[in-house]
Amino acid sequence: MLLLSSPFVSVSPPPPPLSSHGARPALRIEAARQLTGRVVTTKADKTVGVEVVRLAPHPKYKRRERIKKKYQAHDPDNQFKVGDVVELQPSRPISKTKHFLAIPLPPRDTRRKSQLLPPLQSDDDQEPSSRE
């Protein structure tokens, strides 16, 4: 028989058994991250470096400051150039550092115009009027 006389050795009771309805752990629901950033490097083949800027409060002064983080994203067609604005879509791990797909976004002003205004009648009439 083993004598447990040391103060450093303790015996804890076994964990309670799982019930039949609690056999699986609770599902963890997370919001999908929609990241938007600017392409800063295109040196590697099929990979772009994207810098994402977010605002976060300073721990001591509580003023919001810009936090920059750089992500590697998959660009299968090598279609992006430095300065392009892209959206990062989460995907399965493609390599050690690539966990996102780069998706093109239209320039900011064109996206806004198409959402706010209906097409003009002058835009519909592309042909010059020929009244003779």
Swiss-Prot record:
It comes from the Eukaryota. Residues 1-11 have a biased composition (Low complexity). Residues 1-23, 104-132 are annotated as: Disordered. Pfam families: Ribosomal_S17. It is found in: Plastid, Chloroplast. The keyword RNA-binding applies. GO terms for biological process: translation. One of its GO terms (cellular component) is ribonucleoprotein complex. Residues 122-132 have a biased composition (Acidic residues). Keywords: Chloroplast, Plastid, Ribonucleoprotein, Ribosomal protein, RNA-binding, rRNA-binding, Transit peptide. One of its GO terms (molecular function) is structural constituent of ribosome. Its main location: plastid. One of the primary rRNA binding proteins, it binds specifically to the 5'-end of 16S ribosomal RNA. In the hcf60 mutation the Activator tag is inserted 17 base pars upstream of the initiation codon. This mutation is seedling lethal, due to plastid ribosome insufficiency. However under non-light stressed conditions photosynthesis and oxygen evolution can occur. Part of the 30S ribosomal subunit. Belongs to the universal ribosomal protein uS17 family. This is Small ribosomal subunit protein uS17c. It comes from Zea mays (Maize).
